Amino acid sequence: MVGGYTVALAVVAYLTRATGRRIGGAVVGGACVGLVVLAVLWVLEALGWCHVGITWAPAFLSLLYVLSIVWCAPLYLLTWRVARRFGWVGLVVVVCVAGVLGPVHDLWAAARFPQWITIAPGLWPVVAIGATYIAEIVVGHAAMRMVAGASRADPLRGAS
């Protein structure tokens, strides 16, 4: 699975013409979000709002952390491109779409694969999942921007 996401990262990096600094920023963004994901999973599990069928062993959590880094990095290369093209308005749209479609995706996955994930009934678990997707975009993009710099400062800005 990590190999597939690594290939996806390479393809997105090529298609977005990402520099080494941007790729590094995307990986740092993924690393920050990996910690957020692990913390949120633990909190949702403790509240009884969500159960993910994972083993809470350190080795498995380390693998999940590495997977989330490689899985999120292409997303931040894309959000960087959106910010470059559409500015903060484009990022707000991406965040809103993620906040709506993220819970839809997770509810679909819970209905289709109940052995992998179960979500408690009610509004608050869905709101928490939406907030998690929003936090993933905001935290990851902010971390990437701290490493790679603002998208408007890109030397390829006018070369689309």
Where are these regions (language model features)?
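Aromatic-rich, lipid-facing transmembrane alpha helices and their immediate juxtamembrane interface loops
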Residues: 1-160
